[in-house]
Amino acid sequence: RSVCSNGCRPKPFGGCSC
C-alpha cells in the first residue's frame, strides 16, 4: 500500500491529494 505524508491520499495517477 502506498501511503502519502501527513494523512494525504495517494492518487491513482501518482502524486498525493491533501
Swiss-Prot record:
Disulfide bonds join C4-C16, C8-C18. It comes from Anochetus emarginatus. One of its GO terms (molecular function) is toxin activity. GO terms for cellular component: extracellular region. Expressed by the venom gland. This is U1-poneritoxin-Ae1c. The keyword Secreted applies. It comes from the Eukaryota. It is found in: Secreted. Belongs to the poneritoxin-Ae1 family. Its main location: secreted. The modification Cysteine amide is found at C18. Keywords: Amidation, Disulfide bond, Secreted, Toxin. The keyword GTP-binding does not apply.
